[in-house]
A protein has these predicted regions:
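Bacterial Sec-dependent N-terminal signal peptides
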Residues: 1-22
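Feature marking well-ordered beta-strand scaffolds used for ligand recognition
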Residues: 18-151
Length: 151
């Protein structure tokens, strides 16, 4: 029985890495050479989130430096429209997390001397304004969740 389990696990793991992308096409790729990788894993980018504001589609990417907001309405011509520096930044930052609600983006980080940042998105793509940046409520957090059912 143990041999059968071992063989099955081996076959399943090989099949899982042999998957191809079907009907997917890379439309845009962004990288910023001035950003540093994390000291733990050398990852520069660490989270992605998306939302619609003012009839445009936006993507959020977390990095070791902060929050990058992209207009992806025309995916092949996507562009970074806003950058918000994290309360803490640099190689100590491994993970950021985001959630949006009612025109605001909520941002947290799992490392460093971080904070809860609340960013007003209502004037995108022209501006994104940090309206709250404090560690009074949250200093570090791996994930953020908004219970939308409770309003």
């Amino acid at each position: 029985m143990k041999k059968l389990l071992f063989i099955t696990m081996g076959l399943v793991s090989n099949l899982s890495i042999a998957q191809t992308n079907e009907n997917l096409e890379l439309l845009y790729q962004w990288s910023e050479d001035s950003l540093v990788g994390s000291s733990a894993y050398n990852n520069t980018y660490n989270e992605v989130w998306g939302f619609v504001m003012n009839n445009k589609e936006f993507a959020v990417i977390g990095s070791t430096a902060g929050t990058h907001i992209f207009d992806v309405t025309d995916a092949e011509n996507s562009k970074e429209v806003q950058f918000i520096a994290g309360e803490d930044f640099g190689p100590a930052i491994i993970h950021r997390d985001y959630h949006d609600r009612n025109g605001y983006l909520y941002a947290v980080s799992d490392e460093g001397n971080s904070s809860l940042q609340i960013i007003d998105l209502k004037q995108l793509p022209d501006t994104a304004t940090v309206v709250y940046d404090s560690n009074e409520l949250i200093e570090t957090s791996h994930n953020i969740f908004i219970d939308e059912a409770k309003n």
